[in-house]
Amino acid sequence: MSTVFPPEASSDKMNNIFDSHAHYDSEAFDEDRDSLVASLPDKGICGVINCASDIATSHTSLELAQKYPFIYAACGVHPHEAQEAAGNWLDELKLLCRNDKCVAIGEIGLDYHYDFSPREQQKEFFGRQLALAKELDLPVVVHDREAHEDTLELLRR
């Protein structure tokens, strides 16, 4: 079954909010995630893209997207997590991104503020994920913090 994206908005103006960047997979929502997410349409939310930060949260984002028809997933490895990614992460990401409920690759990019992962590694991961997005014809959700020139350079390639 093919996913309709974006969802059709209601004629009621209160139901036309599309949250393009959320993290409902965060442990901050563990206590009441289901009740909170289930209540979103009643609060005027017609759609949500839940952005992942690593392979594990890519799986979780897709689980949320499968459970709720108005949630979609962006799967990817955030620059903070590049150092922690291991093995065949790109192959696994590619499989996840082929899911009908995955509508983007993200949250990906560069973060030179904290440097939780070495900058060269961040650039490598960002470049590989941009190439995957091109291969799969998916848009990207970009994280850019204090790395504007390098981010633009990689996006222009």
Task: Give residue spans per PLM region.
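Mid-domain alpha/beta scaffold segments of enzyme catalytic cores
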Residues: S2-R157
